């Protein structure tokens, strides 16, 4: 595995993997220091009126307010075309399949839709995932000041904006919740392992 991270966010007509449609996907690749590589991609995918009409009320309002619903109607991009565009961008920065983990916020939901609709993209990514929401949940339990002090998130509910927010959020946790660089000494690490005892 290499140090780069593939950040993906999807917008869907809902969260039901059995029936809802993937209507927007964005991707950014970062290095291990969370610097964005390249311009990234943000693709709106066409869905028919029946799929849009089946959205739950809260999702309907969210996508109408963001302008996504109108863009979905106007888009002529298919799932297969979107998948190839995302893969082309990722391959520029991650030339070997299976080496970079997927990163994002509550990323398992996105991964489910990617696995269903974009199998080539799914298999190009490493099976491991870095979920910023896991760090958020641990911070809430262990470091509530960090949790409650986190920067406010925007409410764009658009894929590329959501990725940028996730990267910003992980930068925040890195500076507040993780051990400062260069990290613990070898002897400090050994002491923690000894304290934990055998498995």
Swiss-Prot record:
Gene Ontology CC annotations of this record: cytoplasm
Keywords: Cytoplasm, Exonuclease, Hydrolase, Nuclease
Localization terms from the record: Cytoplasm
Domain Exonuclease: 5-170
Chief location of this protein within or outside the cell: cytoplasm
Signal peptide: none
Disulfide links within the chain: none
Enzyme Commission identifier(s): 3.1.15.-
Superkingdom in the source lineage: Bacteria
Positions of the catalytic residues: 127
Single GO term (MF): 3'-5'-RNA exonuclease activity
UniProt xrefs under Gene3D superfamilies: Ribonuclease H-like superfamily/Ribonuclease H
Matches recorded under HAMAP family: Oligoribonuclease (MF_00045)
Family: Belongs to the oligoribonuclease family.
Function field: 3'-to-5' exoribonuclease specific for small oligoribonucleotides.
Protein name, UniProt field: Oligoribonuclease
């Amino acid at each position: 595995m290499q140090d780069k991270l593939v950040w993906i966010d999807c917008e869907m007509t809902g969260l039901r993997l059995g029936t809802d449609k993937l209507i927007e996907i964005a991707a950014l690749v970062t290095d291990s220091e969370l610097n964005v590589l390249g311009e990234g991609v943000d693709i709106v995918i066409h869905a028919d009126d029946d799929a849009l009409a089946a959205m739950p009320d809260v999702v309907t309002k969210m996508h109408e307010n963001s302008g996504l619903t109108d863009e979905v109607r106007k888009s002529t991009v298919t799932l297969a075309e979107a998948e190839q565009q995302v893969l082309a961008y990722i391959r520029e920065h991650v030339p070997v399949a299976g080496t970079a983990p997927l990163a994002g916020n509550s990323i398992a939901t996105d991964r489910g839709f990617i696995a269903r609709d974009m199998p080539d993209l799914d298999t190009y990514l490493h099976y491991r995932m870095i979920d910023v929401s896991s760090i958020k949940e641990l911070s809430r339990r262990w470091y509530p000041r960090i949790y409650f002090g986190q920067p406010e998130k925007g409410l764009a509910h658009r894929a590329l904006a959501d990725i940028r927010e996730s990267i910003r959020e992980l930068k925040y946790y890195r500076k507040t919740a993780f051990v400062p660089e260069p990290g613990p000494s070898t002897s400090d690490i050994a002491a923690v392992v000894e304290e934990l005892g055998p498995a």
